[in-house]
A protein has these predicted regions:
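C-terminal regulatory or interaction extensions
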Residues: 1-155
């Protein structure tokens, strides 16, 4: 995370160099740890840093529906003791607030909405955090170009 931009901000005489993006990436990493299924033989925790984002993959499937995760407010941790321990040392927010924290940070930057992908065949979950506006604009342009054709089709 060292190459993420850090603004110069002072609170009194102390420099504050953590941004909502830093907090969101850390939250993604914490979620990777507390929601992993460590009993799976084939599973491995994986973090990939790209020039334009991050990808976090952990073994196990989601314990809540995607819609509920995106909405926030609920958590069903696979490793609640680990979650409690991390919160006690200052990592992680209130239960159920982590994913909305990520969504808010990305929305404020105008970046592509974070994508949570559940692969039930490989039994793994991947969080994709793209730090770009491109895909968002491409989707918008595609929708605008095809708006009329979508309106005409009735299913």
């Amino acid at each position: 995370m060292e190459d993420l931009k850090k603004p110069f901000k002072l609170e009194g005489i102390q420099r504050i160099d953590e941004t909502p993006v830093h907090k969101a990436v850390r939250e993604g990493f914490i979620n990777l740890i507390i929601h992993s299924d460590y009993l799976m033989d084939s599973g491995v925790l994986k973090v990939i840093k790209y020039s334009d984002g991050f990808e976090f993959t952990n073994p196990g499937i989601l314990k809540l529906p995607l819609e509920e995760i995106y909405r926030g407010g609920n958590s069903k941790s696979r490793n609640p003791h680990m979650q409690t321990m991390l919160r006690m040392v200052g990592f992680g927010d209130n239960v159920g607030s982590g994913f909305p924290t990520i969504l808010d940070a990305w929305d404020k930057e105008g970046w592509v909405k974070p994508e949570l992908i559940e692969d039930t065949i490989l039994n793994q979950v991947t969080l994709v955090l793209k730090m770009s506006k491109e895909a968002k604009e491409e989707k918008t342009n595609f929708a605008q170009k095809n708006e009329r054709s979508f309106d005409k089709k009735r299913f």
